[in-house]
Amino acid sequence: MTLSQLKNCQIITALVTPFHADGSINFKALPELIEHLLNNHTQALLLAGTTAESPTLTHEEELELFSEVQRIVNGRVPLIAGIGTNDTRDSVDFAKEVANFGGFAAGLAIVPYYNKPTQEGLYQHFLAIAEASSLPIIIYNIPGRVVVDLHPDTLLKLAQHPNIIGVKDCTNLDHLAYIIENKPEDFLIYTGEDGQIFHAMNLGADGVISVASHTNGSEIFEMINHITNGRIKEAAQIQRRFLPKVNALFSVSSPAPVKAVLNYLGFNVGPLRLPLVACTRQEADAIINIVLDKAPKEYVTKGVLRPDY
């Protein structure tokens, strides 16, 4: 599907990668999982993001995953490919490859991690990716994971490039409000923080790139629908019930919690690849009870890790 269709999508799911017990990709688990997502208000899919455990996927596995998901989806919703690394040349090559591969509305390029570039280095990095191919680029700013923060003014400078179409923002509401207020009119703003959906949408964001939509898509849809129609109190009531679930889904390094819930629901997404490990039985039971409303409301007090899409 096209970029114009992506612009109408408010709930984008960062798809997990199902694995067999031996660590190989379980492609047979994808159709049922994807149908579940599409039936619960997912309007677009992000492939090979961090929730997909992309750091542990080989390039060949990513391409095979792209082909299989495209076959299953069959044009029903737009697809976004995770194409960013901390090597500009590699990111440029991947953007070109995905553009030639076809079938993607955009590519998601993360702020480079580990090598700690300056703002000028970040600007040049994303400029090179944007100019490498016709693939529209969404920048992914998640300083809690990559250490470096793409400053709002650097992002707004990049937003002037016609092939940089949006940002997935995992910073804070001050940052988000600033870029929404000052962005070009057609520049897309997605929060990458499930817990910020209520505030981000009220500030004027276009949607969310979500982990929680794997398990709580109907709640997210209902909340956004209330906001869109001016029913803020009703949306806030959903947000209050939703926050403990988000806390549970990020109480252990993601995507371990969401995989625990999906496995419980019968979707056979399997284990994680090292260095990530599955939740303990005790952790999984607590997470499942909260996320699926199987126990009295309980807040997770250990703290919330920054979502990793």
From Swiss-Prot:
It catalyses: L-aspartate 4-semialdehyde + pyruvate = (2S,4S)-4-hydroxy-2,3,4,5-tetrahydrodipicolinate + H2O + H(+). Its EC number is 4.3.3.7. GO terms for biological process: diaminopimelate biosynthetic process; lysine biosynthetic process via diaminopimelate. One of its GO terms (molecular function) is 4-hydroxy-tetrahydrodipicolinate synthase activity. Pyruvate binds at T51, I209. It is an enzyme of class 4 (lyase). Pathway: Amino-acid biosynthesis; L-lysine biosynthesis via DAP pathway; (S)-tetrahydrodipicolinate from L-aspartate: step 3/4. The keyword NAD does not apply. It comes from the Bacteria. It is found in: Cytoplasm. The record marks T50, Y114 as: Part of a proton relay during catalysis. One of its GO terms (cellular component) is cytosol. The active site is at Y140, K168. Keywords: Amino-acid biosynthesis, Cytoplasm, Diaminopimelate biosynthesis, Lyase, Lysine biosynthesis, Schiff base. InterPro entries: Aldolase_TIM (IPR013785), DapA (IPR005263), DapA-like (IPR002220), Schiff_base-form_aldolases_AS (IPR020625). PROSITE patterns: DHDPS_2. Catalyzes the condensation of (S)-aspartate-beta-semialdehyde [(S)-ASA] and pyruvate to 4-hydroxy-tetrahydrodipicolinate (HTPA). PANTHER family: 4-HYDROXY-2-OXOGLUTARATE ALDOLASE, MITOCHONDRIAL (PTHR12128:SF66), DIHYDRODIPICOLINATE SYNTHASE (PTHR12128). Homotetramer; dimer of dimers. Belongs to the DapA family. This is 4-hydroxy-tetrahydrodipicolinate synthase. The gene is dapA.
